[in-house]
Every structure is written in C-alpha cells, then in structure tokens.
Amino acid sequence: MLPLSISTSPDPASQFPTVPDLPTLTPTPSPTSGTAKMNEFTISNLCPEASDRLSLEVSPSSTGLLEPKSSTVSPAPSCTGYPIFDLTGISKQSSSGVSSTRTSSLEPKSSAVSPAPSSPEASNPNKRPAYSYNALIAMAIQNSPFKALRLSEIYAYISNNFPYYKMENGGWQNSIRHNLSLREEFYKVQTTDGKGSFWAMNTQLGSDVYIGKDCGSLRRKKNGKPRKYSKRSNTVSNPNPIPQIPSFTPSPLLATPFPLFLYISQAYAQNPNLLPMMLQNFQHFNFQNIPALSFPFPFSNSNGNPNSRN
C-alpha cells in the first residue's frame, strides 16, 4: 500500500498583494464657499436705494412662533360690508350629494319668505302663522328656481317652512286650491306633454304685488288710477321659464286649399316634369280677377254647378 500524500493548495486571497489602509480625510469648510458668500449679501448690498425706504423688523410678535396660540378664534371683520355667516351649525353631509341645509345656511334668509328663528312660528309650532293662504302661495312660487311649481310642491313648501300646517289635517290644502283658482295673481301653465300643470304668478302685475307687514296678506300698490289687467286665461301670454308650446293642428283652410293649388298638386302627382312650366305661367296670373269664394269650397255638387256659391 502506497501512502497517500495530500497537498493543500495555498489560500487564493494570499496570492494578491495587500493594499495599505488609506488615511481618512475630513473636509474642512472653506471660508470662500458658496454658502458663506450668499450669507454675506444683504438687501443694502444688493439695492442700497431700497434699504432707505424699507425697514424689515422681525420680532416674535410678528411671526407668532414664540407666542402660544389662543384656543378661541375671534371672527374677523367683514371687509366688503356683507354679514359673516356662522358655519358652526352646518351639518356634515356625504360628499355624494349636495345638502339643502348647507346651501340654505350660507345664504341670508328673508323674514318674508320663511319664519325667522325668533318668530312665534319657530318657537311655537302649534301657533298658526300670520300669513294668508295667497301670501304662502306667493312665497312658494317666488322661491322656486323657475318661478313655477306644481300643486304638490306648493303643499310641500308650506308644510316644511310652517310646521303648523304639517300637523293640521288636509283642510288647508283645499283653501290653497281655491286661492289658486280664484286669485288673479296666479295662473296655470300646462306642460308640453299634457300630463300635468304648473302654477305661476302673473308677471303683468310686476312689483305691484307685495305681502303686507300688518295683515300678512297679498296686497297691491295703489298708484293713482287703477291699472287694467287682462283676464287670466289658460294660455301663457307672459314670458315664463316654462312656456306652453301649442300643438299645431291644420285648419280647414289648409285642409281644403285654393282650387288652383289643388290642380297644381294633382298635375304634379301625375307628371312632375310639368311643374316648372306651370309655375312659370303662375307668375303671370292676375289674382285681382279671382272672385271671392265661399267656405267650404264646393268642389263637387251633384245638384248644380260645382263653382256655384252657397
């Protein structure tokens, strides 16, 4: 048996020369660095003229960094003269829809439109409001976006703004319908599809209509001679955001045209090429010699002449 000789190979790392450690370098700030140069510039160096007119004073009170902030913030004065609205009473609503409470709290409310918080209607809902039915109707219509409301929307406005009518029976709704029908200030606007109607105010009255402060009823101004207004009708004669578009129905005159036009239409139906020639001759036609025809036109009459008059 021959003895086995195991030779160990040298370490691979020992084959490379060792690198001496490099000395650590610590950077020393240079007095001529860019930061030091920028710190040397002041406003007086850049613009000597401005230093005479501007005085920059930095104090702890002006910055507010060293003073503790107060827990209560006093409201700032209004610059434009409009009242500052209190936003603390706004209820939080979801971002998906717009809340009517948020919109109404940002806009000033008129005391003639809805009861104020200090009014008897708000403190005592069981007390009847001091407004007549026609005044309540005028409030509802004038506060609508299009100045026209359906009957159910008028009911909803009155019951929401005056809780007294929400607790009452439906007798007051009959009074609302009677005032809409009998008062000259209101008129009905039919919808274009004929499936409903809106109630609007007569715009011919203009600013003559107002709500009396003493009686709470709808009043008119009396300036000299009384003005004459046209009778209220179902048709819309005044400009309105929801106008009534009348449907066009052919009249009997259009259904039975002038005989000459009837002959032209019949000839065109038989031969369209004859129409230019007939129109050319039609320009030289004397309309003054045409006798007045009765209505309806007797196109066919078995008892006599078809052109005879009744």
Curated annotation (Swiss-Prot):
Xref: InterPro entries: Fork_head_dom (IPR001766), FOX_domain-containing (IPR050211), TF_fork_head_CS_2 (IPR030456), WH-like_DNA-bd_sf (IPR036388), WH_DNA-bd_sf (IPR036390)
Bias kind Basic residues: ranges: 218-231
A GO CC term assigned to this protein in UniProt: cytoplasm
One biological process term in Gene Ontology: anatomical structure morphogenesis
Subcellular location: Nucleus; Cytoplasm
Compositional bias (Polar residues): 1-16
Keywords: Cytoplasm, DNA-binding, Nucleus, Transcription, Transcription regulation
Region called Disordered, residue ranges: 1-37, 58-77, 92-126, 217-242
S-S bonds: none
Domain of life: Eukaryota
Annotated Pfam families: Forkhead
Disruption phenotype: RNAi-mediated knockdown in adults has little or no phenotypic effect on adult or their progeny. However, simultaneous knockdown of forkhead gene fkh-2 in adults causes 8% embryonic lethality, and nearly 80% arrest after hatching as L1 stage larvae.
DNA-binding region(s) from the entry: 128-220
MF terms (GO), sorted A to Z: DNA-binding transcription factor activity, RNA polymerase II-specific; RNA polymerase II cis-regulatory region sequence-specific DNA binding
SMART domains (alphabetical): FH
SUPFAM superfamilies, A to Z: Winged helix' DNA-binding domain (SSF46785)
Location, primary (coarse class): nucleus
Biased composition (Low complexity): 17-35
Function (record text): Transcription factor. Plays a role in embryogenesis and later development, perhaps acting redundantly with forkhead protein fkh-2.
PANTHER family cross-referenced by the UniProt entry: FORKHEAD BOX PROTEIN (PTHR11829), FORKHEAD BOX PROTEIN PES-1 (PTHR11829:SF398)
Protein name, as recorded: Forkhead box protein pes-1
